[in-house]
Amino acid sequence: MLLLPPRPPHPRSSSPEVMDPPPPKTPPFPKAEGPSSTSSSVAGPRPPRLGRHLLIDANGVPYTYTVQLEEEPRGPPQREATPGEPGPRKGYSCPECARVFASPLRLQSHRVSHSDLKPFTCGACGKAFKRSSHLSRHRATHRARAGPPHTCPLCPRRFQDAAELAQHVRLH
C-alpha cells in the first residue's frame, strides 16, 4: 500500500480545478545521432519509472502527486524446493537424485528406479524387471529365438501374424 504525505491546507481559490500542469512529453530514450539513426542501441541507463496520482484534498481541490516507483522483480519469487514438493520452476523433485518432474505421478514412477523392487517376472526364464515395458521388450527375445508362431500347413513358411498366414494360405 502506498502511503502519501498529507497535502498542506490549500486556500480556497476562485477556480474549483487547481491542478499541476502536465509534464512535457519527451521521448523515453535519447535518439541516436549520425547515419545509423535507426539502430536499436540505447545509450545510458533506463529512466526511473514515475507514478502520477490524481488526488483530492480535504477541501475538494484536485492535485497530482508524483512518486518514483521501485523496479519490481519479474516473475514470482524463487525459492529452493524441498524433496517431494513442487520446485521453483518445473514441479516435483526427487529426494534421491534431485531430478524435477512435472507431476507427482511421474516422480512416483521415477522413484522405482532407485528401489530394489522388481515386481515384473518373465514366465519363460524367471528374470525380473522394475518396469512392465522392460519385461515386454524382454519377452520379444524369447519369441525371436523360437521363430514366428504361425506355420503354414502347406509349406515350411512361418509368420508372426495370423492374418499374414491366412493371406498366404489363400495364395496356395
From Swiss-Prot:
Region (Disordered): 1-92
Keywords, sorted A to Z: Chemotaxis, DNA-binding, Inflammatory response, Isopeptide bond, Metal-binding, Nucleus, Repeat, Transcription, Transcription regulation, Ubl conjugation, Zinc, Zinc-finger
GO MF assignments: DNA binding; zinc ion binding
Glycyl lysine isopeptide (Lys-Gly) (interchain with G-Cter in SUMO2) cross-link, chain position(s): 31, 118
Keyword Transcription: yes
Zinc finger regions, C2H2-type: 92-114, 120-142, 150-172
Intracellular or extracellular location(s): Nucleus
GO annotations of cellular component type: nucleus
One Pfam family from the record: zf-C2H2
Ranges of compositional bias, category Pro residues: 19-30
InterPro entries: Znf_C2H2_sf, Znf_C2H2_type
Domain of life: Eukaryota
Coiled coil: none
Disulphide bond pairs: none
Major subcellular site: nucleus
GO annotation terms (biological process): cellular response to hydrogen peroxide; chemotaxis; inflammatory response; positive regulation of endothelial cell migration; positive regulation of endothelial cell proliferation; positive regulation of gene expression; positive regulation of interleukin-8 production; positive regulation of leukocyte chemotaxis
Subunit structure: Interacts with SMAD2.
Protein name: Zinc finger protein 580
Species name: Mus musculus (Mouse)
Gene name, Swiss-Prot/TrEMBL: Znf580
